[in-house]
Amino acid sequence: MKVVHKICCGIDVHAKMLVACLILTNGQKEIRTFSTMTDDLLRLRDWLQAANCTHVAIESTGVYWKPVFNILEDALTVI
């Protein structure tokens, strides 16, 4: 399989929390849980940037994804 992004993140968003899985090309992954409060979403953004993650895929059920997208869109490519 061709590697398109060396580091990426998948995010599953719920009403009060989200689960983010950071995946590296060497097969390593790190899973963290964040609340959907703004301060925690900013911590999520900072964590992703510190890991040199450039692309994020968000599971977009309902409207819960919108605050996450709004925080991440200026710093990362959000799909």
PLM region spans:
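Phosphate- and other anionic-substrate recognition elements at nucleic-acid/protein interfaces
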Residues: M1-I79
